[in-house]
Curated annotation (Swiss-Prot):
Biological processes annotated in GO: organic acid metabolic process; xenobiotic metabolic process
Keyword presence, Cytoplasm: no
Annotated localization: Membrane
Gene: cyp516B1
GO molecular function: heme binding; iron ion binding; oxidoreductase activity, acting on paired donors, with incorporation or reduction of molecular oxygen, reduced flavin or flavoprotein as one donor, and incorporation of one atom of oxygen
Organism of derivation: Dictyostelium discoideum
EC number(s) reported in the record: 1.14.-.-
CDD domains: CYP1_2-like
Membrane-spanning parts: 1-17
Membrane topology: Single-pass membrane protein
Stated name of the protein: Probable cytochrome P450 516B1
Cofactor: heme
GO cellular component, one term: membrane
PANTHER family assigned: CYTOCHROME P450 307A1-RELATED (PTHR24303:SF31), HEME-BINDING MONOOXYGENASE FAMILY (PTHR24303)
Amino acid sequence: MYLILSLIIFLAYVAFHKKRTNGMPPGPFPLPIIGNLHQLGKSPYKSLKSFSDKYGGLTTIFLGSVPTVLISEPNILREIIIKNNDSIIDRYISDSGLIIGGERNLLFSKGSFWIKYRKIFSSAMTNARKFNIASRIEQQAISLNNYFGTYANSKQAINPHDYIRRYSLNGVIDYSFSDSVEYESDTHHIVIRAAEIMEEILATGNPHDYLPFLKPFYTKKRNTLAMAVGQVWDYCNDAITVHRKTLDHEKPRDLLDLILMEIEKSEEKQFYDDDSLSKCLTDLIVAGHETVAITLGWMILFLSNHQDVQQKVYDELINVVGKGNLPALVHRKDTSYLNACIQETMRIRTAAPLALPRIASEDIKVGGYTIPKGTQVMMSVYGMASDERYWKDPHIFNPERWLSSNHSTENGGGGGGVVGNSSQSEVFIPFGVGPRMCVGMGVAKDELYYCASQMFMNFKWSPVNDKPIDDEGVARIALEYKEYQVVLERRK
């Protein structure tokens, strides 16, 4: 009797699933309630790539009861994100997303709010170059490398993790607010500690985002996240108050000054309020530094393991910059090999294996399939960056793939590594694609270049006892490295 009843229930569920996915892309069969969550394993980004390998560039999965379409093919991505932009521009907002921004920040907002605030931030960041605000990042890179210098030639192994994270956070809060923390200080700046708490909570994922009935079991975790977010909001609100009182329109100090100036010029300045502005600034602090910190950590690891590559970077910097001189952004166009190393690091160990999800605001027809309104849509950044159809030997660290006599690597170009008909700009999207592309991309690239150029011009980085460092990533929301130790030697 129970067997027959179970069979009837199972067949009814199969029929229900077939009906609700009619016309959608293929994918693995989901279980009731949990969907395909049980199949993601310890390395979700790898599991999702295996789904794409099996089912194609458009794959349907269920995260809990949330229907999700995974994109892992560039021509499909281009058609969906670019050609159907108005139908796919909004974010899918989870419970954690609501806690972080309440739909009034840059990462997790929709409609006119997102459009207007992004425009203000984008304009301010463009103007930041006119006022040389990036010089603040340069000074942070100098401070970090001066600190590394205290370890050089001591033969003392160090773990660079905490220092590069402090650099990336310092870069953001100095660039944005004219604030920073000394590298040798044991004191945790309140915003740095709050950001660390947020990252710790978000890094491992939150099951209640897709299984809402679990919320009561995650009350403490959700409250801790809300408290940490609130501390950063308060910090940003205080900074807004101080900056507004001390603003000099002729001599803007940082990004926040420029944002306030943009708001003053706006015909809709009444639309912008301090609480929403503080939430948007929080995005820069928390999300803005993550890519930089993780990429620099991976870059030190790979160049320590590949001494021949590191030597080529050093030789290029000496040739372009000259001994005794300081690398600067003006040198970037002439340091193609260093640029290639940065890009190869971001490809082989992309900090964000999955771009933040979007939601279809209406039915989308693509590739003979339908993505129904309300479906969560994810882009597999890792999947495209490691697909053998587009990259030769994708799991090998090879900066040479980015070099071409006909292309520059300065801004993400290069033509040497992609096979088939896709260009690198289509299969290499560490900062996203389309209007939702990371608004702080330019700042992140500057942070990476300033720090990497100084690190590899001033020091030789080596594994402890010349034993190769483990380059397997830690599977979290971001693709992080396992913490490691290296030995520094000052270049002569």
